Curated annotation (Swiss-Prot):
UniProt organism field: Rattus norvegicus (Rat)
Modified residues (Asymmetric dimethylarginine): 60
The entry's keywords: Acetylation, Centromere, Chromosome, Kinetochore, Membrane, Methylation, mRNA transport, Nuclear pore complex, Nucleus, Phosphoprotein, Protein transport, Translocation, Transport
Pfam families, sorted: Nup84_Nup100 (PF04121)
Keyword hit for Protein transport: yes
Bias type Basic residues, positions: 22-32
GO-annotated cellular components: kinetochore; nuclear envelope; nuclear membrane; nuclear periphery; nuclear pore; nuclear pore outer ring
Gene Ontology MF annotations: structural constituent of nuclear pore
Family label: Belongs to the nucleoporin Nup84/Nup107 family.
Gene Ontology BP annotations: female gonad development; mRNA export from nucleus; nephron development; nuclear pore complex assembly; post-transcriptional tethering of RNA polymerase II gene DNA at nuclear periphery; protein import into nucleus
Annotated positions of the Phosphoserine modification: 4, 10-11, 57-58, 69, 86
Residue numbers bearing the N-acetylmethionine modification: 1
Name of the protein described by the UniProt record: Nuclear pore complex protein Nup107
Post-translational modification: The N-terminus is blocked.
Length: 926
């Protein structure tokens, strides 16, 4: 049946199930074909470097502000977008731009423009693959937060991108940041989409992270757009600003305005940015819009009117419009058919959504698709008038734009003010005419509201410029004064935003990324740093890890551009992020962020991190990474060792005079022992390893932890002293070693002598207590037992002789080693020879205390050995050694210790007297 005649037909609206199924089947088939085609040609989230100019506001022609360096001989192809994009702006920023993402679709398949936007943010340029499905399934089986697990790779991805780009490609870097976020958003969206209602609570964190990464993605997009323009502007000369001629057209005037006025230009960039966000979210209209595909509008009303003309009509006589011109419902104040009214409301809402996304051409296509070509025409009137033939020429060129744009705009303004129209229809024409008051009621989110303000601001500033620069004889009614004379500033926009009565907008205004976006738009880096400081002081530990990553890389971006950031805030952000990386075990990333701290802080921060690294292989890797990041590895490793060895709050204590077992080695002691490993990786640090090892061993010796001290000693490579001398000679130095190194070597040898003496004493002590036992014979032993006893006695005598010989050798050895300590060459044990070294009061104090703690005890032990082996005369010679002015050992003895030493010497003298000798061991002369 020919529907165009409408004769004797039932309602033509697609409400019949069969028709609906058929239509939807056809539509679905077409969408599949379109989607398959677009998957090969379009990324579902448009890379920012490939954004085709949109139509974000009225008075837009295909325009991207060209580089001002080209203004002497302007290339019109840049202005009109016919040859390529401006080198300054990857993203179209022109107030006059009028190209959509899809420019070659006819009216019959307009829906294809949206099929690749099915998931909006939740899409990416990558093709779906079986491998990706498997990876997603694996991620979803992980612990409590699959989103966090899936997005963990972003930390390393961002660092790799940062290291890959130089300062000259900083905007390519920002674009890569955005692409990383987009890829991750794609993954998280798939995870969320597969969540069931039973495990939605588990995936709620993933959904929150998805939103967070979406916001980060668009913030990088905004940053690149604004700062590319700002940097380019700062490099260009002020006197190259474009000025329109006297008889310039509207279009020429506005082009010149965009060239010279950064406020207008950057405000338009904000509008473009907000429209790109809306475009990402817009979805697939082929699924959402349910209009009948005939190019006849208000078809149900038309059908009802046709039916009423028939004499046999018995249906409803409810009042309807009697005419079907576009103004009829308003003029007659009569309604449309209910179904048409529903479709009309739905259509207007989607039209506004398209306008909000800067897709005016798509909105016009939709109007024509739905039979409202007249409405498509009303969306055309914003184009700026330009007659290229005014300046003469051999050939006539077509005139552009609307010569009656002022009348059109006033009509749009009035239409937006008329309460008889639907709120979305009023909002459409409010957006076209710059009527902020009528545009705000349909703006429910922060992005929508900011878009409304900035769109109207640009519209107003452009209109003011046209009014003052374009000569016209038209004396038609003006737009309202408050619109034409508005004094717009970026700060004023956000002040107005703060005063809104919409609760949702106020809440969203406080969200982290919206605060960042606000200060980026304002260009207020100091204000942004103050906000960062507030966040850190208020909730440092609860800030999302990805937000900290963003904050860190934003600061690095500003530094790369040479922009000043508040140093103390930048440092705190970096330190907080580094601590996050430490907590999350991102070991390979820490060095490269630490190197951006001031040197002293970098050393302290990385040393703090290394304290927790215990595996040898991992330690070596961390030092290699520190070298790659140009950190001061030598100072860092020294700091690590000093930090750990100074953690013990134990003090040097006086030894008791009795030989006792070593104090047990604790876990804290084990940390101090192992920390020396940090200094032995690099041979150039052998001198430092020696110094730090000595410091640790001094403390262990004071606490009688000889085994722990020995373990530290073993950690120092045996060739360390030779290595120190070799390195000094390789530097071509003919002078002696530095005093610090010389003294460290001597101290190392002192400790070695003491440990050897102590070890030999312990060995002798154990051997002395392991003497063979003399066999015993029972009183009533048999002959056989007596024979066996004789054999045992012979074996005992043999074993005892061997034992005695070994004991004598050990005794001689321990005597020698103890004398080596007590009579240490060149000034004594633990006494520096070089006095020209840098003063170290703590070390000097410890060495004096060690002499007082160890030497008296060693002297008593030596006396015990000599006395127990009957060497009484040599015992008395200890008095000569202690009192000698050459060695001055008496200075390290306390009065109590000297008294005890004299008591022991008295005992030895008595033993000599018992042997018939004089008190000093000499024969008594008769």
């Amino acid at each position: 049946m020919d529907r165009s005649g409408f004769g004797g037909m039932s309602s033509p609206v697609i409400r019949d199930p069969e028709v609906t199924r058929t239509a939807r089947k056809h539509s679905a088939h077409k969408r599949v074909l379109i989607q398959a085609n677009q998957d090969e040609n379009f990324g579902t989230t448009t890379p920012r470097s490939q954004i085709i100019p949109r139509t974000p506001s009225s008075f837009r022609q295909p325009f991207t502000p060209p580089s001002r360096s080209l203004l002497r001989h302007p290339d019109i192809s840049y202005i009109f977008g016919t040859e390529g994009r401006s080198p300054r702006h990857i993203q179209s920023s022109g107030y006059l731009g009028n190209l959509s993402m899809v420019t070659n679709l006819d009216d019959s398949n307009w829906a294809a423009a949206f099929s690749s936007q099915r998931l909006g943010f939740y899409t990416n340029t990558e093709h779906h693959s079986m491998t990706e499905d498997i990876n997603l399934s694996t991620v979803m089986l992980r612990e409590d937060d699959p989103g966090e697990a899936a997005s963990m790779s972003m930390f390393s991805d961002f660092l790799q991108s940062f290291l890959k780009h130089s300062s000259t490609t900083v905007f390519d870097l920002v674009e890569e940041y955005e692409n990383i976020c987009a890829s991750q958003v794609n993954i998280l969206s798939k995870i969320v989409s597969r969540a069931t209602r039973w495990d939605w609570q588990k995936f709620s964190k993933t959904a929150s992270m998805l939103w967070l990464l979406q916001q980060e993605m668009v913030t990088w997009r905004l940053l690149a757009s604004l700062y590319r323009d700002r940097i380019q502007s700062s490099l260009e000369e002020e006197n190259m600003f474009a000025i329109a001629g006297i008889n310039a057209s509207e279009k020429t005037v506005v082009e010149a305005l965009f060239q010279r006025d950064s406020l207008v230009r950057q405000s338009q960039l904000v509008v473009d940015w907000l429209e790109s966000i809306a475009k990402d979210e817009i979805g697939d209209f082929s699924d959402n819009i349910e209009f009948y595909a005939k190019s006849v509008y208000w078809e149900n009303t038309l059908h009802s009117l046709k039916q009423r003309q028939l004499l046999s009509y018995i249906g409803s006589t409810r009042p309807l419009v009697t005419e079907l011109d576009p103004d009829a419902p308003i003029r007659q104040k009569m309604p449309l058919d209910d179904l048409d009214r529903e479709d009309e409301v739905r259509l207007l809402k989607y039209l506004f959504t398209l306008i909000r996304a800067g897709m005016t051409e798509e909105a016009q296509r939709l109007c024509k698709r739905c039979g409202q070509a007249w409405r498509a025409a009303t969306l055309e009137g914003w184009k700026l008038h330009h007659d290229p033939n005014v300046n003469g020429g051999t050939e006539l060129e077509p005139v552009e734009g609307n010569p009656y744009r002022r009348i059109w705009k006033i009509s749009c303004w009035r239409m937006a003010e008329d309460e008889l129209f639907n709120k979305y229809e009023r909002a459409i024409y409010a957006a076209l005419s710059g009527n902020l008051k009528q545009l705000l009621p349909v703006c429910d989110t922060w992005e929508d509201t900011v878009w409304a303000y900035f769109r109207v601001m640009v519209d107003s500033l452009v209109e003011q410029e046209i009014r003052t620069s374009v000569m016209t004889l038209d004396e038609t009614e003006e737009l309202p004064r408050e619109y034409m004379e508005a004094n717009w500033t970026l700060e004023k926009v956000f002040e107005e935003l703060q005063a809104t009565d919409k609760k949702r907008v106020l809440e969203e205004n406080q969200e982290h990324y919206h605060v960042v976006q606000k200060f980026l738009i304002l260009g207020d880096i100091d204000g942004l740093m103050d906000e960062f400081s507030k966040w850190l002081s208020k909730s440092r530990s609860s800030l999302p890890g990805h937000l900290l990553r963003f904050m860190t890389h934003l600061i690095l971006f500003f530094r790369t551009l040479g922009l000043q950031t508040k140093e103390e805030v930048s440092i705190e952000v970096l330190k907080t992020y580094i601590q996050l990386l430490i907590n999350e075990k991102h070991t390979n990333l820490i060095a490269f962020y630490t190197c951006h701290l001031p040197q002293d802080l970098a050393v302290a921060q990385y040393a703090l991190f290394l304290e927790g690294v215990t595996e040898c292989e991992q330690r070596h890797q961390c030092l290699e990474l520190a070298k790659e990041a140009d950190l001061d590895v030598a100072t860092i490793t020294k700091t690590v060792v000093e930090n750990i060895r100074k953690k013990d709050n134990g003090e040097f204590s006086h030894h008791d005079l009795a030989p006792s077992l070593d104090t047990a080695t604790t876990e804290e002691d084990r940390l101090k022992i192992d920390v020396i490993d940090w200094l032995v990786f690099d041979p150039a640090q052998r001198a430092e390893a020696l110094r730090q090892g000595n410091a640790i061993m001094r403390k262990f010796l004071a606490l009688k932890k000889h085994e722990a001290a020995k373990e530290v000693f073993v950690k120092i490579p045996q060739d360390s002293i030779a290595e120190i001398y070799n390195q000094w000679e390789e530097q071509g130095m003919e002078s002696p070693l530095p005093a610090e190194d010389d003294n460290a070597i001597r101290e190392h040898l002192c400790i070695r002598a003491y440990l050897e003496a102590h070890e030999t004493f312990n060995e002798r002590f154990k051997h002395m207590n392991s003497a063979p036992q003399k066999p015993t014979l029972l009183s009533q032993a048999t002959f056989t037992e007596k024979v066996a006893h004789e054999h045992k006695e012979k074996k005992y005598e043999m074993d005892h002789n061997i034992w005695k010989g070994h004991l004598d050798a050990l005794t001689a050895d321990v005597k020698e080693k103890m004398y080596n300590v007590l009579l240490f060459v060149d000034g004594g044990w633990m006494v520096d020879v070089r006095e020209d070294a840098e003063e170290d009061p703590e070390r000097a104090h410890q060495m004096v205390l060690l002499r007082k703690l160890c030497l008296p005890m060693l002297c008593f032990l030596l006396h015990t050995i000599l006395h127990s082996t009957g060497q009484y005369q040599e015992c008395l010679q200890l008095a000569d050694m202690v009192s000698s002015e050459r060695h001055k050992l008496y200075l390290v003895f306390s009065k109590e210790e000297l008294r005890k030493l004299l008591q022991k010497l008295r005992e030895s003298s008595l033993m000599l007297l018992d042997q018939g000798l004089d008190p000093l061991g000499y024969e008594i002369q008769s």
